[in-house]
Curated annotation (Swiss-Prot):
Keywords: 4Fe-4S, Iron, Iron-sulfur, Lyase, Metal-binding, S-adenosyl-L-methionine, Thiamine biosynthesis, Zinc
Residues at which substrate binds: 248, 277, 306, 342, 362-364, 403-406, 442, 469
Name of the featured protein: Phosphomethylpyrimidine synthase
UniProt EC number: 4.1.99.17
GO molecular function: 4 iron, 4 sulfur cluster binding; carbon-carbon lyase activity; zinc ion binding
Stated role: Catalyzes the synthesis of the hydroxymethylpyrimidine phosphate (HMP-P) moiety of thiamine from aminoimidazole ribotide (AIR) in a radical S-adenosyl-L-methionine (SAM)-dependent reaction.
Record InterPro entries: ThiC, ThiC-associated_dom, ThiC/Bza_core_dom, ThiC/BzaA/B
SUBUNIT field: Homodimer.
Source organism superkingdom: Bacteria
Cysteine disulfide links: none
GO BP: thiamine biosynthetic process; thiamine diphosphate biosynthetic process
């Protein structure tokens, strides 16, 4: 997109690559108990098994879909108008909110009145902000603790189940071997859940709306869903649900435009970003955020201290509670779903970082540390935490309690500063829960593999099982340019141990601002890590997709292999580098082993030989060995023969 502001406002359009359905996929909707609960999923169509392999039908599989209306050909996408307000009716029906006469943030009013920002502003439908009525609490946690199952909770239950039961039933009716096929495709290894809900190897265990309600009421899961972001499709973050991933986007003082950030958001959700954080620190933060929220079907998070710092020209010591409070209200009225707030960075912890290799690496943490030292006072975020809770519950903004003292190197992992802050975050969680405000806890950082589980165990203990949300962790410091891999290793491990959401790392980590390609690379890496964690935990149905892809691979259904994978485009591109012809898409080999050494083709030959001889596969292998032994002796018992 052109960075010219007038062009952006007048002619902004969505990136065409972000709206095309993925190959052999279509958007389907599952309706809940009322017509306006329509839960999106991605249906991946599969080819029939070739006759030589049995000839059965392979029904579609269903996968979790974060792309919103963008990949629905029936949806009219116009980013100048924004997305439909999916949750508006549910919010209004609860009767506990009020529409304000206008913005109540001083900064928001100033931006709205500034003619210099007119060409930058989101031009779509203008809705006055909504807030809880006096004395009311509008958080999903509050409803859950009242025993209320909201439409959001029902939506989430349907979404988490991914039509597993329907898929298994379709397998059973696929032919004479349907029951056997269903048993095979639904098979799943028992997991090790480390104290999370034990589903065993039951692929059909169902996530119910009541289960969702109970997890939210206990504080073990959150539903980030600001009442001013009705465009969002409800999702849940908790260790007893699918592991989620977050994608960071945002401009900087030196690069990127509003249009580029909207593009990154739509690109991130296409590939599986469950939430997106706008970490903009450059120009027009307010306007950039409005464009992103109005066009985002996933929850949006921010770090409000970044914008507050811009309001005081980058001087941390000039920050005040009043400026920060106004920033919270400004962003809550725009519709931000969760705030990273570094309230655990206390004055007493700052000296503990003096002997670190890399000091304080969190931007938010360093801002608050500098403020504490400049004033030699306790952090205003800590001192005013109860007042922050009052703001959060008026809009249903969730806390993401920031790890401002996270280790920025392997050397600093699990040190006194990091763990001291974590204990404080546990104390703040209890305060937030008194207000029925939803909380997740942010975690490291750079941690070697042998120390990762300790991080998880301490967080579960000190923070009373509030969802953990971690950046990686990176398991080594030696690979600039590959930190999506160094962190993906740690992410898979900590996700298995109980982390509920993983914040992606791109190849540009520590090096520069990521572009769209970097965003995709980070997303795919972290989708892989999250899925590996789901498998290891034994989450219901986690293995269905693996089984479907493995069956397609064994039957040489190349197109299905590509399409079931996390990145069909890259899989197809790699295959076609060496075997580009269409005929190669039905060949019983790839370029790795060629036609004579494909292990799966050899296995198929053994099975075919066994069927012809009327013997078991083991006996067939034995007979085959005997035949080859005779041939070997007849040819002179030489290992090599001159051609």
């Amino acid at each position: 997109m052109n960075a010219n502001p007038k062009f952006l406002s007048a002619d902004a359009h969505v990136d065409a690559a972000a709206v095309a359905p993925l190959p052999n996929s279509r958007k389907v909707y599952v309706t809940g108990s009322q017509p306006d609960i329509r839960v999106p999923m991605r249906e991946i169509t599969q080819a029939d098994t070739p006759t030589g392999f049995g000839g059965e039908k392979n029904p579609p599989i269903y996968v979790y879909d974060t792309s919103g209306p963008y990949t629905d050909p029936d949806a009219k996408i116009d980013i100048r108008a924004g997305l439909p307000a999916l949750r508006q009716g549910w919010i209004e029906a609860r009767g506990d909110t009020e529409v304000l006469d206008g913005l109540s943030s001083q900064y928001g009013l100033e931006r709205a009145a500034d003619p210099a920002t007119a060409d930058l502003r989101f031009p779509g439908l203008h809705r006055n902000p909504r807030r809880a009525q006096p004395g009311k609490n509008v958080t999903q946690m509050h409803y859950a603790r009242q025993g209320i199952i909201t439409p959001e909770m029902e939506y989430i239950a349907i979404r988490e189940n991914q039509r597993r039961a329907e898929y298994i039933e379709s397998l059973k009716s696929s032919g004479p071997n349907g029951a056997k096929l269903a048993a095979m495709m639904g098979r799943q290894h028992p997991g090790q859940a480390f104290g999370a809900a034990a589903f065993g190897a039951n692929a059909l265990a169902e996530i119910t709306p009541e289960f969702v309600r109970d997890e939210v009421a206990r504080g073990r899961a959150i539903i980030p869903a600001n009442i001013n972001h009705p465009e969002s499709e409800p999702m849940i973050i908790g260790r007893n649900f699918l592991v989620k991933i977050n994608a960071n986007i945002g401009n900087s003082a030196v690069t990127s435009s509003i249009g580029e950030e909207v593009d990154k958001m739509t690109w991130a959700i296409r590939w599986g970003g469950d939430t997106v954080m706008d970490l903009s620190t450059g120009k027009h933060i307010h306007e950039t955020r409005e464009w992103i929220i109005r066009n985002s079907p996933v929850p949006i998070g921010t770090v409000p201290i970044y914008q507050a710092l811009e309001k005081v020209n980058g001087k941390a010591e000039d920050l005040t509670w009043e400026i920060f409070r106004d920033t919270l209200i400004e962003q809550a009225e725009q519709g931000v779903d969760y705030f990273t707030i570094h309230a655990g960075v206390r004055l007493q912890y700052v000296p503990l970082t003096a002997n670190r290799m890399t000091g304080i690496v969190s931007r938010g943490g360093s801002i608050m540390a500098k403020w504490c030292l400049a004033h030699h006072k306790e952090s205003f975020l800590y001192e005013h935490f109860e007042e922050i809770c009052e703001i959060m519950k008026a809009y249903d903004v969730s806390f993401s309690l920031g790890d401002g003292l996270r280790p920025g190197s392997i050397y600093d992992a699990n040190d006194e500063a990091q763990l001291g802050e974590l204990k404080t975050l546990g104390e703040l969680t209890q305060i937030a829960w008194k207000h029925d405000v939803q909380v997740m806890i942010e975690g490291p950082g750079h941690v070697p593999m042998q120390l990762i589980k300790e991080n998880m165990d301490l967080q579960l203990d000190w923070c009373k099982e509030a969802p953990f949300y971690t950046l990686g962790p990176l398991t080594t410091d030696i690979a600039p340019g590959y930190d999506h891999i160094t962190s993906g290793i740690g992410a898979a491990m900590i996700g298995w141990f109980g982390t509920a959401m993983l914040c992606y790392v791109t190849p540009k980590e520590h090096l520069g601002l990521p572009n769209k390609d970097d965003v995709k690379e980070g997303i795919i890496t972290y989708k892989l890590a999250a899925h590996a964690a789901d498998l290891a935990k034994g989450h219901p149905g986690a293995q269905v997709r693996d089984n479907a892809l493995s069956k397609a691979r064994f039957e040489f259904r190349w197109e299905d292999q590509f399409n079931i994978g996390l990145d069909p485009d890259k899989a197809r591109e790699f295959h076609d580098e060496t075997l580009p012809k269409d005929s190669a898409k039905v060949a019983h080999f790839c370029s790795m082993c060629g036609p004579h050494f494909c292990s799966m083709k050899i296995t198929q030959d053994v099975r075919e030989f066994a069927a012809q001889q009327g013997v078991s596969e083991t006996e067939a292998l034995k007979k085959g060995m005997e035949v080859k032994a005779v041939e070997f002796v007849k040819t002179g018992a030489e290992i090599y023969h001159r051609q």
